[in-house]
């Protein structure tokens, strides 16, 4: 496989993928936090909550970057 065949068709593909996966992870992490709370495992609650915040930050940043890039393409 050549390097060229691995390149995405859309220049924003990887950014969109990060937005999708970060958002998807948020939903999973909410479940993990709930499970840990039900089990009384505060260490896991804290860990999953920190990971959740990282994913929320990544998703928000990806959204902002994508909006900016798409607006610049329109100009």
Residue spans for each PLM region:
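Iron-associated oxidoreductase/ferritin-like identity signal
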Residues: 1-75
